[in-house]
Regions:
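N-terminal amphipathic alpha-helix/helix-capping segment at the start of soluble metabolic enzymes
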Residues: 1-19, 23, 59-60
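A short acidic, helix-capping loop that chelates divalent metal ions and anchors anionic groups
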Residues: 74-79
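Structural motif
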Residues: 32, 61, 97-98, 151-153, ...
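A short, Lys/Arg-enriched amphipathic alpha-helix followed by its capping loop at the start of a domain
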Residues: 12, 16, 28-35
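Active-site-adjacent beta->alpha loops and helix N-cap segments on the catalytic face
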Residues: 23-24, 43-67, 81-89, 106-126, ...
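Conserved, mostly hydrophobic/aromatic
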Residues: 29, 94, 121, 133, ...
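Hydrophobic faces of well-ordered beta-strands that scaffold small-molecule active sites
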Residues: 14-20, 37-39, 66-70, 102-104, ...
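Ordered, amphipathic secondary-structure segments that act as subunit-interaction surfaces
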Residues: 89-106
Length: 181
């Protein structure tokens, strides 16, 4: 169910993903050469789940894959039972509307990946692609977290190497890439 890459992405060998918070930004990202968009709302809050209308408009207007942020609110990545159920429903809606992937992250109070809840969301998201988002950057042990995510079958991790900027996290990112194979 993949969408074609843009010419720029196909010729450079590098897939550029743009994080966008509107349909207009998604269209501009595709026109600018992005090979995939991560559709969010409320980027000021670090990104939250976009509306069904925004997902549908992006799917209808774009030729590139649309990955949908699944995050019921800004703030930390510790979710109540009600928020977790909202995330499950939002994944079902994203699938129904034709998203190519979903992006989420759930942690436990001790700073580790909430493996049980993440497993449920991964299972419900399939066959969509799954990305674990920047919750990874506040986990207590990135090596342990990556092993947990690999075991869960998650294909992508969005990280700045636990630094404020990706440039500052390059050593950690490089180590994680080696670990992930």
């Amino acid at each position: 169910m993949g969408a074609p890459m843009t010419e720029a992405a196909a010729t450079s060998g590098v897939l550029v993903e743009a994080c966008v918070d509107s349909v207009e930004s998604a269209v501009a990202a595709e026109q600018g050469g992005a090979g995939r968009v991560e559709l969010c709302d409320n980027l000021i809050e670090g990104g939250t789940t976009p509306s069904a209308g925004a997902i549908l408009e992006c799917r209808e207007r774009l030729r590139i894959p649309v990955f949908v942020m699944i995050r019921p609110r800004g703030g930390d990545f510790l979710y109540s039972d009600v928020e977790f159920e909202v995330m499950r429903r939002d994944i079902a809606v994203a699938k129904e509307l034709g998203a190519h992937g979903v992006v989420f992250g759930i942690l436990r109070r001790d700073g580790s990946v909430d493996v049980e809840r993440t497993r449920v969301l991964v299972e419900e998201a399939r066959p969509l692609a799954v990305t674990f988002h920047r919750a990874f950057d506040v986990c207590r042990d990135p090596v342990e977290a990556l092993e947990a995510l690999i075991a869960l079958g998650i294909e992508r991790v969005l990280t700045s190497g636990q630094a404020a900027k990706a440039e500052e996290g390059i050593p950690t990112i490089a180590a994680l890439v080696r670990q992930g194979g």
